[in-house]
Amino acid sequence: MVLVLVVGCQSGASPDRPDESGQSSPLNQAAGSIPNLPLKRLDGSAFASGSLNRDSATVLFLLSPECPLCLDYAYTFRTLAEEYQARGIRFVGLFPGTYFSELQIKKYCSRFRLEFPMVLDPDYALTRALGANTTPEALLLNEQGQLVYQGGIDNWAYEVGQKRLEPTEHYLRDALQAFENGQKPPLARTKPVGCLIE
């Protein structure tokens, strides 16, 4: 199963290029490196983050119901999840911080019919462990919790407030297709454009 996590609004290096900041995710390490944190799903049930180290690949989206790009990309989140969950890849939304209420998150998910599990990270514990700092941001993890891809969903938004008519590069989809074919993604890391996680 694959987990995609989305968070995040910032502008930085062009997402058309690999992230050349020199910063590496804490997940660029051994399998099973995600700590087992006791978190809660939006529906109130328990979520142990250590489950991301096993069973299936996961796409993890870091999200915020107040970030304009999380609103703009909601349809893309849904279509990717519908397509790839049917092929055995798990999708999870992660909401870091407490700047918004659970009611706001529920309204966001209901409005855009996002039906994959949503996890709350009020203390940023999992967000920090993932090395994520933007919403929306996507991570693709293999079945052992190792990072396959991290960054933007595509290059539709190339700066905050600036979008192409249509994306010309589909970073996350390309990474998913490569993963399914047993290959490395064309880009393992891109610079996400969106809202800074605070």
Where are these regions (language model features)?
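C-terminal motif of bacterial Sec signal peptides marking the signal peptidase cleavage site
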Residues: 5-8
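Short, internal strand/loop/helix patches
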Residues: 108-150
